[in-house]
Amino acid sequence: MLALCGILALAVLGGVYGIGRLRSNPAAAACEPAVATAGRVAPLAHGEVAALALAHTPFLVPVLAFKDAEGHARTLKDWRGHTVLLNLWATWCVPCRKEMPALDALQRELGGPKFEVVAINIDTRDPEKPLAFLKDIGVTHLTYYSDQSAKVFQELKLAGKAFGMPTTLIVDRSGCEIGEMAGPAEWASPDGVKLVSAAISSPDGASAITQ
């Protein structure tokens, strides 16, 4: 009887965990193409973008809520169908300030219907300060996005994708991570442009994700 109970218990546990496996995160499964893209662009992660950590496991980037320059609510989901270089920055972050011209230049060179640099400012106090800073350094190609609550950083931190500033993620057309960068980079350098161009042109990343 005890042996039979043990067998039944194992069967029940196996059934439960089997169901769990069958119901594994569909978003993660849909992000497999982004991992393939990461593998494809990995040989280009050198020189000025050598610190880019390419995705080895599927990860759907949180939707993230922020605002545009007019104060309209936006989420990262608005960019489904586009490859995105997502960057979190602040005026109090010296490396962020130094990186902004390169991000602006990358948007000038590659920005269009297939790609955008989405740089989100997370200053929590004076909302005019980052705008004045961007004007002072001559940034003209980046669209201004902000989150004065800094929740976008906290969400990425909880997901293990943000540890400091600046934080940058390359996100594919389905909202899945291709790679992440902790710290600044010369994104408009030949190394950066070549890598991002390869990510944009990748045939992967067309899986439909509804969440």
Predicted regions and their residues:
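Thiol/disulfide oxidoreductase modules built on the thioredoxin-like
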Residues: 132, 136-141, 147-199
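N-terminal targeting signals for export/organelle localization
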Residues: 1-61, 208-211
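Extracytoplasmic
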Residues: 59-61, 79-81, 112, 128, ...
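Alpha/beta-hydrolase fold active-site loops
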Residues: 83-84, 115, 166
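A short beta-strand-turn-helix
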Residues: 53-58, 63-84, 209
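Conserved redox-active cysteine motifs that mediate thiol-disulfide chemistry
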Residues: 80, 88-105
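Structural microenvironment flanking redox-active thiols in thiol-disulfide oxidoreductases
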Residues: 98-138, 148-155, 211
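Short, low-complexity, Pro/Ser/Thr/Gly-rich segments in the mature regions of secreted, periplasmic
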Residues: 197-210
